[in-house]
Amino acid sequence: MKILIINCGSSSLKYKLIDMANEKDIIEGIVERIGLDQSRLVQKNELREKYILEKEIKDHKEAIDIVLNTLVDPKVGVIESIDEITAVGHRVVHGGERYSSSIIINEEVIKYLEECSKLAPLHNPANIIGIRACQSLMPNKEMVAVFDTAFHGTLPEKAYIYAIDYALYKDHKIRKYGFHGTSHKYVSHKVAETMGKDIKDLKIITCHLGNGASISAIKGGECIDTTMGFTPLAGIPMGTRSGNIDPSIIPFLVEECGYTIEEVSESLNKKSGVLGISGVSSDFRDIEDAASKVDKRAQLALDIFHYRIRAEIGSFIVNMGGVDVIVFTAGVGENSPETREECLKDLEFLGLTLDKEKNKVRGKLAEISQADSKIKAYVVPTNEELMIAKETVELIGK
């Protein structure tokens, strides 16, 4: 069984074809600059060999048509017919309050996703365009929506309700939603499997640390809290996002500094985080390199990042009544031994002892705690596309 995964952005489309018989990637690619100059398709096969097609691509429907034709192309394709694709799994950013799990797409689902677009104006409209395009080009294929927010649908009210006028929640659905849910779900299940434990018996903290970053508390297989909120801006500092700040800073910027609301949003989303603090880059590799050369602001950016992660881990341990395993994933979490060491140092009093030799691992599944550590720590490479494929297979029941 082969599942096609589609992830549509406003001017891009990522895709991956997965063979569910062995859960291996067959091929993956991206269509870039849709509707813009210099649009192109870049595809990589399982040997990481590249195929590049440069041509005008005016919209997402044309992009998906090109993807499908490339998949069956005699020279660079990997299947003989589109009939070999069993179903399509779509990454959808926001499922609102209604969808706390993945769902087979129909008109009612699409209508609700359109209503949710006000909650994710940069993402949901593009996701819907991709769904419509696939339905038009593959009318007989079942389509499944897998939501970034869904895994956090188990948050209790005390975790997701903000301490603001309750009418703002009732009338406008302003609450914590959380994001990166597909990643948090995948790595939590993967670490339980690796440990040979039933996830229902575990208390897990998952740290998805990349240019976007979030941390989740997972108890008995259900997410009970997460750091991102109404939007992906909330939580810990990230590459360019501020994370949590005092809300009064916003009117201060408008009234005293002359910012427009658009400029405030631009600053907090694209000019803050470790980029804003360091003045160096939003790439943690560049910041670590600068810090190693005694750049004080770069070191400060890292110190704040690590401090805020530790604060959230501590909070989640208290609210879960303990923790069995802490997981690091995504670009920084998987590839920065320095970040992991700083986040886990001096935790022997809790029963967690890091193995510095094991912690040198990059990008591979590995335990990084000492053998006798009561609390375990792992690096688990995320695989959101495989999680989407698994959810798709589960729903279509084939």
From Swiss-Prot:
Gene Ontology biological process terms in this record: acetate metabolic process; acetyl-CoA biosynthetic process
Compartments in which it is found: Cytoplasm
Cellular component aspect of the GO annotation: cytoplasm
Keywords: ATP-binding, Cytoplasm, Kinase, Magnesium, Metal-binding, Nucleotide-binding, Transferase
NCBIfam families found in the cross-reference section: ackA (TIGR00016)
Residues holding substrate: R91
Protein's pathway: Metabolic intermediate biosynthesis; acetyl-CoA biosynthesis; acetyl-CoA from acetate: step 1/2
Protein's recorded name: Acetate kinase 1
